[in-house]
Every structure is written in C-alpha cells, then in structure tokens.
From Swiss-Prot:
Belongs to the CemA family. The chain crosses the membrane at residues 6-26, 113-133, 188-208. GO terms for molecular function: antiporter activity; proton transmembrane transporter activity. This is Potassium/proton antiporter CemA. Keywords: Antiport, Chloroplast, Hydrogen ion transport, Ion transport, Membrane, Plastid, Plastid inner membrane, Potassium, Potassium transport, Transmembrane, Transmembrane helix, Transport. Pfam families: CemA. Its main location: plastid.
Length: 228
C-alpha cells in the first residue's frame, strides 16, 4: 500500500522538477557553446524589423550626441577618425547583443519543446499513476465544504478574469512571446489581453450552468451570494 502511494508522489515530483532540471542542464551545457559558435562562425545576422529599428535608433542617437559635441568643441580630423571607429565598435556590440537575445530565444524554445515531449511521454506511459493522482485530487475537492469550494472558485475567477487580471495576462503573454521567439507587438498583446479574459469568463459561466447546477446546486447558491 505504501509503495502504491509512493509511486504517484514520485511521479508528481518528477512532473514538477524534471522539466526545470532539463531546461537548466540544457542551458548550462550548450548555452556558452552556441553563443561562441554564433558569434564566430555565423556570417549572417538574423534581425527582425523591430530589432533593426532599435539598432538604428541607438546608432542615430549616438551620432547625434557626437555631432552636437563636435559643433561645440570643434574636434580635429583625428578625433573624427576615432568617432568612425567608435561607431563601428558600437554597431558590432549592438549586433552581438541582439544575437545573444536571439540565441536565448532559441534555447528557450528548444527547452520548451523538450519539456513538452517529456510531459507528453509521461501522460502516455504512466496512465495508472495519473489516474491515482486524479482520484486523489477529486477526493480532496469532494471533502471540502461548499463554502470553501465557492471561496476557491471566486478567488480563481478574480485572478483570471477579475478587474486586475489584465496585468497578469499581459505579463504571461509577453513571456510566451519571448520564449517562443515572436517579435514583441503591443497591438497583438493588447488584443489578446482584452480577448482571453472574456473567453474564459464565457467558458466558466457555461461550466457553472451545465455542471455545477446539476452536481451541487447549493454550491452555486453560495457562490452567487459571495459574488453579489
């Protein structure tokens, strides 16, 4: 009996920590090697439109500051030569910085794929342990009082679709964009932030109407009383 209880707990622990360990090991073992290879062997620089615009803006700002300083102090030709060298070094530094961001995106994307494969394999290979965990969760929820259940549902809905939820959605979607290598786009993110809470609110109300009203009408009454 103890062995049967230990195996699902081990499975749950591996679900939580194994993807994190794989991600950490992958970044530590291959991160520095990929950065070195990219900066020494890669002749082509991969920049999207937003990155190119950012680099150009920084270079233009650097040039404008120098030209303003030159107009005030009237530097000789030798200083102008140093300025051109400085512009060249600044350009290389900016490109390396953006390439490092791109490499970081590739590493994040690769580790996300690996973690997804691991979790998918777990779900197919250990159905029995997953069934036991599911039964434990259902039993735990069933033993809670209707008041605690209603309070938990109210807290969860306020976090996901409440007044302050757009800030959390914005952080989560921005993190998703960064991990999977998409260019940051404020318009798309704003559209998703304004759409997702509405979709989840609709799904949640449908779930209350179809499931909770049939399974536990008293829970629905308590929930509506708290919500009002």
């Amino acid at each position: 009996m103890e062995k049967k209880a230990f195996i699902p707990l081990l499975y749950l622990t591996s679900i939580v920590f194994l993807p994190w360990w794989v991600s950490f090991s992958f970044n530590k073992s291959l991160g520095s090697w990929i950065i070195n290879w990219w900066n020494t062997s890669k002749s082509e620089t991969f920049l999207n439109d937003i990155q190119e615009k950012s680099i150009l803006e920084k270079l233009i700002e650097f040039e404008e500051l120098f030209l303003l300083d030159e107009m005030i102090k009237e530097y000789p030709e030798t200083h102008l030569q140093k300025f051109r060298i400085g512009i060249h070094k600044e350009t290389i530094q900016l490109i390396k910085m953006h390439n490092a961001d791109r490499i970081d995106t590739i590493l994040h994307f690769s580790t996300n794929i690996i973690c997804f494969v691991i979790l998918s394999g777990y779900s197919f290979l250990v159905n029995e342990e997953l069934f036991i965990l599911n039964s434990w969760v259902q039993e735990f929820i069933y033993n809670l009082s209707d008041t605690i259940k209603a309070l938990s549902i109210l807290l969860l809905t306020d976090l996901c679709i409440g007044f302050h939820s757009p800030h959390g959605w914005e952080l989560m979607i921005s993190s998703f964009y960064k991990d999977f290598g998409f260019a940051h786009n404020d318009q798309i993110i704003s559209g998703l932030v304004s759409t997702f809470p509405v979709i989840f609110d609709t799904i949640f109300k449908y779930w209350i109407f179809r499931y909770l009203n049939r399974v536990s009408p008293s829970l629905v009454v308590i929930y509506h009383s708290m919500n009002d």
